[in-house]
From Swiss-Prot:
Lineage, highest ranks first: Viruses, Riboviria, Orthornavirae, Kitrinoviricota, Alsuviricetes
Swiss-Prot/TrEMBL catalytic activity: RNA(n) + a ribonucleoside 5'-triphosphate = RNA(n+1) + diphosphate
Recorded GO MF terms: ATP binding; RNA-directed RNA polymerase activity
InterPro entries assigned to the protein according to its UniProt record, in alphabetical order: DNA/RNA_pol_sf (IPR043502)
Protein name (Swiss-Prot/TrEMBL): RNA replicase polyprotein
Amino acid sequence: VIVGTPPISPNWPAIKDLLHLKFKTEITSSPLFCGYYLSPAGCIRNPLAHFAKLMTCVDDMSLPEKVLSYLSEVSIGHNLGDQIIQHLPPHLIQYQSACFDFFCRNCTPSQKLLLSNDPIPESKLLALVHKIKWASKAFFSELPQKAREFLVSKSSLPSFPNNPKVSELESELLHFSQ
């Protein structure tokens, strides 16, 4: 999905006949891709679909298992702030509000941190780091220096992927996630 009309590369005439692609062009004010509305400001989870998922998990009582996943999905768009109203079709604003209200009523204070644009306090991150055994590169890069140093000091594995133990753990994670 490309939001907006991209400029045509000066190389296009030379390579277009080498490609066997057919581009699907759709002009819309609210492009939807894989359940997310896309905009120049960012993406927003389709609030109607999200609301339906929330109500289904309330009905089948699976909310505790799914709440963090669903909260993460909605927090992406929520963190756009007031811009969200400009980039959603008007009939979906009420569902976005309903999802936000649902999370405000049903999430713990620590879960609600996902809905905040403020940085997570360093004290909370440091407390969290003492409990985890593994951190993704993206998460690690967002941590304050003290937390990164602590994780490195408690790690018994070298920080390079050629280590057989690291490869073994990664393969176990892959099987676990499938």
